[in-house]
Structure formats: C-alpha cells, structure tokens
Amino acid sequence: MANPKAKMSKSRRDKRRAQFNARTKPVTTVNCPNCGEPTLPHRACRHCGHYRGRAVTGKTANG
C-alpha cells in the first residue's frame, strides 16, 4: 500500500483542490450598473472604476 513520503501542507493541499473548481465552474460575470461592461461580482468595475454606485478608483466613465 502506498504511503506519502512527507506531510503535505494545508496550503499545498488547498492549491491542488482549487484547480478542480477552476477547471469545472464557469466564470460568473455581472453587468456594471454604471457603464454596462461585464465585471466580476463583488469587485470594482475595471472599465469605469465604480463599485456599488461610488467611484473607488481614479478612472473616468469613458475609460
């Protein structure tokens, strides 16, 4: 019966397990209510810099 040669750290174990989800689940996107560009949920828009109705980065509305 095979035995591991050394203990695998929790970080290495979790990195390996994360690859399965990254390959199987599609990326979820939502449209920015300010400019309409597709963005990742719960993150500021890369195009206009708004999040939840407020400008959080120094970008302008036209890019």
From Swiss-Prot:
Compositionally biased spans, kind Basic residues: 7-18
Record-linked InterPro entries: Ribosomal_bL32, Ribosomal_bL32_bact, Ribosomal_zn-bd
Keyword ATP-binding belongs to the record: no
Entry keyword set: Ribonucleoprotein, Ribosomal protein
GO cellular component, one term: large ribosomal subunit
Domain of life, source organism: Bacteria
Pfam families, per database record: Ribosomal_L32p
Ranges for region Disordered: 1-27
Family: Belongs to the bacterial ribosomal protein bL32 family.
HAMAP family (alphabetical): Ribosomal_bL32
PANTHER family: 50S RIBOSOMAL PROTEIN L32, LARGE RIBOSOMAL SUBUNIT PROTEIN BL32
UniProt-recorded name of the protein: Large ribosomal subunit protein bL32
Organism, scientific name: Chlorobium phaeobacteroides (strain DSM 266 / SMG 266 / 2430)
